Amino acid sequence: MLAARLVCLRTLPSRVFQPTFITKASPLVKNSITKNQWLVTPSREYATKTRIRTHRGKTGQELKEAALEPSMEKIFKIDQMGRWFVAGGAAVGLGALCYYGLGMSNEIGAIEKAVIWPQYVKDRIHSTYMYLAGSIGLTALSALAVARTPALMNFMMTGSWVTIGATFAAMIGAGMLVHSISYEQSPGPKHLAWMLHSGVMGAVVAPLTILGGPLLLRAAWYTAGIVGGLSTVAMCAPSEKFLNMGAPLGVGLGLVFASSLGSMFLPPTSVAGATLYSVAMYGGLVLFSMFLLYDTQKVIKRAEITPMYGAQKYDPINSMLTIYMDTLNIFMRVATMLATGSNRKK
C-alpha cells in the first residue's frame, strides 16, 4: 500500500501523459544527438590530410542528461510496453482460469476440498470475505466524505512531505492497532479499530475522486472482475500452488517500492521518470494480482489448519487485511490507467 500511495501522489495531479504526443524531435533531443556524434579531428601526416574518427564514450554527465531530458516519443513507447506487459499478464491469468476452472489439472484444489471441510472452516472463510466486503464499503464511504470536505481534500491533494508523513503514520498506526487487538477477547475495540483502518484507507483513496464518478465506476467493475477471476483461480488451483511464491513476490515488491520512491524525485516527462512510473504502475498491477493469488490461498490454508479450540483463535479481520490491501492496490492502478488512457484519446 505504501508504494501505491507514493505513485498516486506523484502521478495523478501532474498527469504525466498528455493527450498529444510529439512526433518530431525536440531541440533538446537534437542537441543531445549532436553532442554524441563522431568526433572528427584533423591531423597532418606526411603532407597528406586525413580525417581520423575516434570513438568517444558518453560521460556520466551526458548519461544523466540523456536520462532526464524530455522525450515524449520514448515516454509513449515506455507506456505502451507497460500496457503490453499488463495485457500479457491478463492473458496468462485468463489461461490459468480456463485451465484450473475447467478441471484440467490432476491435482485437488480448494474447491474440491470444500466438500469435506468442517462447517467451522466454511464459516471462517465466509466471515473473512464478509469483512472484506464491509471494508470496501467503509472505504468508499470514507473517500466520499473526504472528497466532500474541502479542508481534508486539499490536505490530501497537496502531496507535500507533511501530507505523506501523516498518511504513512496513520496507515501504519491503524494497521498495527487492528493487528494488536484480539478478535475473541475484545470484539468491540477490534471492530472499532477495523472501521478506523478502513476510514484511513478511504482518505488515501479520496484524491482519485477528481477523476470523476463514471471512470471510478468502470475501475470498480474492472477491479471486481480481476479480483473475482483471480480468487476463482486460487480456489480451483492446487491448495498450495501459489504459496511458494513468497520470495519472488517479496523481491518484486521491493522493486515496485523503489520505483515508486524514485519516481517522486525525477521529472515525470523524463525517460528515467517515465520508466520508474511504468514499473510502479504496470508492474505493480501484475505484482499485486499475484499477491492476491498468494494471499487467497494463505487465508484458506490458515482457516483449515487453525484448530477450533486451540490457544490461538482464527481472526477473520486480520486474515482479510492482506486481500483488502491487494484489492485496493489493484483498484488504484486500474483507475490511474483508465485516466491516462482517456487522456490520450482526447
Curated annotation (Swiss-Prot):
Subcellular location(s) per record: Mitochondrion inner membrane
Transit peptide: first to last position? 1-45
Q: How does the protein's chain sit in the membrane according to the entry?
A: Multi-pass membrane protein
User: What is the induction note for this entry?
Assistant: By growth hormone.
Q: Which GO terms describe its biological process?
A: apoptotic process; calcium export from the mitochondrion; inner mitochondrial membrane organization; mitochondrial calcium ion transmembrane transport; mitochondrial potassium ion transmembrane transport; negative regulation of release of cytochrome c from mitochondria
Q: Which InterPro entries match?
A: Bax_inhibitor_1-related (IPR006214), GHITM (IPR035871)
| Reactions accelerated catalytically | Ca(2+)(in) + 2 H(+)(out) = Ca(2+)(out) + 2 H(+)(in); K(+)(in) + H(+)(out) = K(+)(out) + H(+)(in)
**Gene Ontology CC terms, in alphabetical order:** endoplasmic reticulum membrane; mitochondrial inner membrane; mitochondrion
Where this protein primarily resides, as one coarse class?
A: mitochondrion
What keywords is this UniProt entry annotated with?
Answer: Apoptosis, Membrane, Mitochondrion, Mitochondrion inner membrane, Transit peptide, Transmembrane, Transmembrane helix
Q: Does the keyword Aminoacyl-tRNA synthetase apply?
A: no
GO MF entry, a single one:
calcium:proton antiporter activity
Q: How is it modified after translation?
A: Undergoes AFG3L2-mediated proteolytic degradation, upon hyperpolarization of mitochondria.
Q: Where are the transmembrane segments?
A: 84-104, 127-147, 161-181, 192-212, 215-235, 246-266, 273-293
Q: Which parts of the chain does the record assign to the membrane side Mitochondrial intermembrane?
A: 105-126, 182-191, 236-245, 294-346
Domain of life of the native organism: Eukaryota
Mitochondrial matrix side, ranges: 46-83, 148-160, 213-214, 267-272
What effect is documented for mutating D326R? Impaired protein stability. Skeletal muscle mitochondria are swollen, exhibiting a disrupted cristae structure
The record's family statement is: Belongs to the BI1 family.
Protein function: Plays an important role in maintenance of mitochondrial morphology and in mediating either calcium or potassium/proton antiport. Mediates proton-dependent calcium efflux from mitochondrion. Also functions as an electroneutral mitochondrial proton/potassium exchanger. Required for the mitochondrial tubular network and cristae organization. Involved in apoptotic release of cytochrome c. Inhibits AFG3L2 proteolytic activity, stimulating respiration and stabilizing respiratory enzymes in actively respiring mitochondria.
Q: How does this polypeptide assemble, per the annotation?
A: Interacts with LETM1 and AFG3L2.
UniProt-recorded name of the protein: Growth hormone-inducible transmembrane protein
The gene it comes from is Ghitm
